[in-house]
């Protein structure tokens, strides 16, 4: 077996690398080339800022810029002397990621588009492209680990907790894991990745990480939803948990669970968004204690564990939060129930709930509104 757990010498192993133009995927291509693999780079054209209606000057620092990123990916491929292909996936990305993002907001949920992009465009579609190119594996720059297990490869967190991206990859299927490789998962930190890029004199060695959603580089999510659905921002009432009207709002798309700012309610104790009601158009506000949640209903579960139907786990309800201890009950179909040991605040429908045992990812799903509990 070679270093990618493939029964071939590296020189006979074709690895297709998903090259975004950033330092991580560029370092992956360089590392595999250095190890003697037959490396092919592929970059996806996903989003054209010129047709987005956003002025380039309005973009935040450290956001994606499709044209420059493609240019950077090609420059890296040229520096490494590897073939490089740019594929137009704009229509697929618009349908499966951008439109779903907007639709999730219309349902008064808070989306995580990076998960949908990984699940559909990057792993479903790009994986097919990699096979068409004769690849034995598809490698990406994600900070996660792929480990052999009794029932096949398992998904594990990245070695560096600060860089771990497993939350965004919970929807990866077993079949996809069989073909995927994550060479950066065992890296001690970003400095090690940048050192690889610098050693190979790659033009992106010092490039900053992108921070915002690539198709909303100005950070104005509501404006994007409104461009796609002009009637999305319907005004409505702001009420307390007893139903008393406290004020008015300019549309549910401007709010998420746990939000405090932007309510326009002066005076009194701090109030937080505790529920969004798409049926009535109401924003429900309450105290910080009203945000407490002990039981979470989860749908569209992707399961990577064993046959257990009830087990102790740790769960993440947002990518930036530490995993919290809980009891997981797998229900019929693709549903699950999570009972937390201690209340979590601001559990938002539409976000992912990801299940862990130690460093292993057991899967995850999408958080349902409490009314569906």
Swiss-Prot record:
Its main location: cytoplasm. The record marks 142, 351 as: Interaction with tRNA. SUPFAM superfamilies: Adenine nucleotide alpha hydrolases-like. The active site is at residues 117, 214. Belongs to the MnmA/TRMU family. The keyword tRNA processing applies. This is tRNA-specific 2-thiouridylase MnmA. Catalyzes the 2-thiolation of uridine at the wobble position (U34) of tRNA, leading to the formation of s(2)U34. It comes from Paramagnetospirillum magneticum (strain ATCC 700264 / AMB-1) (Magnetospirillum magneticum). It is found in: Cytoplasm. Disulfide bonds join 117-214. It comes from the Bacteria. InterPro entries: MnmA-like (IPR004506), MnmA-like_C (IPR046885), MnmA-like_central (IPR046884), MnmA-like_central_sf (IPR023382), Rossmann-like_a/b/a_fold (IPR014729).
């Amino acid at each position: 077996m070679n270093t990618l757990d493939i029964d071939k010498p590296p020189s006979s192993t074709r690895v297709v690398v998903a090259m975004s133009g950033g330092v991580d995927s560029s370092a992956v291509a360089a590392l595999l080339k250095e190890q003697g693999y037959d490396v092919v780079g592929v970059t996806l054209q996903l989003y054209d800022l010129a047709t987005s209606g956003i002025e380039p000057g309005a973009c935040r620092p450290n956001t994606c810029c499709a044209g420059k990123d493609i240019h950077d990916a090609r420059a890296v491929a040229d520096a490494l002397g590897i073939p490089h292909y740019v594929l137009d996936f704009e229509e697929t990305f618009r349908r499966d990621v951008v439109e779903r993002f907007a639709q999730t907001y219309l349902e008064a949920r808070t989306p995580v588009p990076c998960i949908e992009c990984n699940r559909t465009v990057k792993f479903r579609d790009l994986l097919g492209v990699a096979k068409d190119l004769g690849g034995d594996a598809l490698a990406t720059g994600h900070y996660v680990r792929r480990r052999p297990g009794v029932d096949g490869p398992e998904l594990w967190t990245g070695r560096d907790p600060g860089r771990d991206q497993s939350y965004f990859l919970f929807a990866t299927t077993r079949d996809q894991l069989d073909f995927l490789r994550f060479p950066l998962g065992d890296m001690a930190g970003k400095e090690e990745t940048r050192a690889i890029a610098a050693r190979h004199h790659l033009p992106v060695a010092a490039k900053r990480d992108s921070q915002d959603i690539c198709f909303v580089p100005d950070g104005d999510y509501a404006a994007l939803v409104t461009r796609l659905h002009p009637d999305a921002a319907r005004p409505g009432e702001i009420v307390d948990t007893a139903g008393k009207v406290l004020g008015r709002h300019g549309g549910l798309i401007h709010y998420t669970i746990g939000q405090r700012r932007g309510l326009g309610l002066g005076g009194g104790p701090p109030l937080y968004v505790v529920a969004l009601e798409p049926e009535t158009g109401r924003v429900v506000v309450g105290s910080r204690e009203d945000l407490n949640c002990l039981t979470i209903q989860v749908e569209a579960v992707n399961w990577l564990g064993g046959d257990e139907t009830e087990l102790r786990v740790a769960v993440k309800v947002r990518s930036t939060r530490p995993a919290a201890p809980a009891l997981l009950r797998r229900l019929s179909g693709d549903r699950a129930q999570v009972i937390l040991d201690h209340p979590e605040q601001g559990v938002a429908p539409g976000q992912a709930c990801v299940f862990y045992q130690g460093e292993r990812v057991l899967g995850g799903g999408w958080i349902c509104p409490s009314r569906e509990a």
